[in-house]
Structures are given as C-alpha cells and as structure tokens.
C-alpha cells in the first residue's frame, strides 16, 4: 500500500494551495522566450488545457521580469519566476506579479541579496522556492562531502532555509534536483526527515520523451509512493505539454489523481486482428478533455478483453472484422471493426453525462 503522505506546511501560491492535505499539483515550465508575451501566453493556455496547475517562466533579464505583468493578465494558473544569478530580477518579478520565486542558492550571491528578496516577498505575501541543483552546489559543500551526495544537496538547501528562517520567512518550498535518480530519491528522503516544508519533486535534465519519462516515473513515483512530495514537474526535452501529461499519468498510476480517462491497452500479439496501437492512441487523444474518472480498455482480442480487462469501466476487444464493446467485463454490443472507435467514444460520452 502507498504510504500516508507526510503532512507538510500549507503554503499559498496565487489561487492554489500546496502542502497540508491539498492535492499534489503538476507544474511545468515554458520553453518560449518570456519576452514574447503572445507566444508564452499561448503555450501556458495549452498547458492549462492539459491540466497544468502551476507554470514557471525563465527570467533572464529585466525585460522578462516586466513581461510577467502582461502574461499574468491572460492566464489562470499561478506563475513562478525562475531566477538565477541576479537577485534584482527576483525583486522585479515580485513587483510585476509573480506568485512565487524560485532561487538557486548556489548562484544567487551574498546573504544581503537574499535578504532583499525576502523583504520583497514578505511585502507581497508570496513564497520562495529554494531550488537546489546538483550542478551548482557551493564549492565548500562539495569539498566537505567529496562531491555530489544526498547529504551535500540537502545541506545546500538547508543552509538557505535557515537563512530565510533567520529573516522571519517561512513560506518556503524546497526542491533538490539531480539527474541521478537514486541520489535524488535519497536526497528527498533525507530532507523530508529534517523539515516540514512542502517539497517540489523532479529529476533535472531527465532527457527526451522516452528516457525522461522513465527516469521521472521511477524517481517521482518512488517518492510519491513513500508519501513524499507536494508538487511535481517532469522535466522533458521538447513540448512541455508532454511534461503535464506524464506528470498526471504518474499521479493517476498511484491513485493520487481521481480525474480523467485512464486508457489501458494490451501489448498485442499474433491473435490481434485490429490496430490496437492506432485505436488506443486515438482514444487517449479524443478523451483527454474528460474530467470524469474512467478506465477505458483497448484490447486486441477476446482473450485479453473483456475478461482480463474487467476492471475497466468500458472497453473494446477486437475480432475478425468486428469487435465487442464491453462494460465492467460484460459484453455490451458487437460492432463492425470500422465503427469500433466511434461507437466506443459515443458510449464514453454517455457515461460522462451520467451522474
């Protein structure tokens, strides 16, 4: 059984709350030029449609910080400003409406710089994420531990956390990202045992859609199974829409997301008479807008379905130029192969409308 989630401090980010008993939220990051407000808003809107809960944007300069105000006018989810090197960009982002600031303790600079960011965040009532990245750990910490270790990553985070606490600031979120899955898992486990601040989970530089999905599913999924984590981001090279889809699938696979259609399908074999791959892909695409929790099966033959997919709410199983639609393991109707997809989608829509 999945372990009971650790109760962390509740923190408000724009119109969302994280930590405490709040749902685990899916975050992504735009890969547009933040200066280009139109393209950035367009991408965020697409991510919102996919179920993205929080969005982060890069703020490499003042122009990007000023763009936040205009971007915020057109989106519905909280916006996080991603800050590196220049603390003044954090302050400008806060002034222009950012709902949260992410800073990297390894490159933000001196204590007085962080103090100025904290003062601005306090004034606006927004949280700060201490986003540790293994690639930019402080030299003294690397020397102390002889390289990148879970203890080194956590110490870097806690060093900044203690500074924020000393300044009377407690609206803190922590992330501890490395590209090494076991190391990341151990770092989050260690941090979870030491603090009660919300943890943002992710594997940094995870890779392309296939390899990145696997690494993220193992890393994020393992931690969530242990009851650790309050927000997640699946870092993938490519369209960030995939990050949201994979993130939501991870939550759904663990029973932590109780909305949307889950499509299950057989791996196919020599008995298969229908194009399972095409059908399953199309069902997934055309049901992605549905919020009602449903499990839909696409099975290649009557051996795998309906019997082996009887836990599905509805499904199809292929035959010779025809197939069956089944509900909860019982055959509902026989349909010609060319009509299988449309008939299945009609039945799904009926189920969505049912109370």
From Swiss-Prot:
Q: Which UniProt keywords apply?
A: 4Fe-4S, Iron, Iron-sulfur, Isoprene biosynthesis, Metal-binding, Oxidoreductase
- For this chain, the annotated S-S bridges are none
Q: Where is the signal peptide?
A: none
| GO MF term (any one) | 4-hydroxy-3-methylbut-2-en-1-yl diphosphate synthase activity (ferredoxin)
Kindly name one Pfam family recorded for this protein. GcpE
Q: Which GO terms describe its biological process?
A: isopentenyl diphosphate biosynthetic process, methylerythritol 4-phosphate pathway; terpenoid biosynthetic process
**InterPro entries to which the protein is assigned, alphabetical:** Dihydropteroate_synth-like_sf, IspG_bac, IspG_bac-typ, NO2/SO3_Rdtase_4Fe4S_sf
Pathway in which this enzyme or protein is active: Isoprenoid biosynthesis; isopentenyl diphosphate biosynthesis via DXP pathway; isopentenyl diphosphate from 1-deoxy-D-xylulose 5-phosphate: step 5/6
Its catalytic activity?
A: (2E)-4-hydroxy-3-methylbut-2-enyl diphosphate + oxidized [flavodoxin] + H2O + 2 H(+) = 2-C-methyl-D-erythritol 2,4-cyclic diphosphate + reduced [flavodoxin]
Q: Which Gene3D superfamilies match?
A: Dihydropteroate synthase-like, Sulfite Reductase Hemoprotein, domain 1
Q: Which residues bind [4Fe-4S] cluster?
A: 266, 269, 301, 308
Could you give the cofactor binding note from the entry?
A: Binds 1 [4Fe-4S] cluster.
Q: Which family does it belong to?
A: Belongs to the IspG family.
Q: What does this protein do?
A: Converts 2C-methyl-D-erythritol 2,4-cyclodiphosphate (ME-2,4cPP) into 1-hydroxy-2-methyl-2-(E)-butenyl 4-diphosphate.
Listed name of the protein: 4-hydroxy-3-methylbut-2-en-1-yl diphosphate synthase (flavodoxin)
Q: What is the scientific name of the source organism?
A: Caldanaerobacter subterraneus subsp. tengcongensis (strain DSM 15242 / JCM 11007 / NBRC 100824 / MB4)
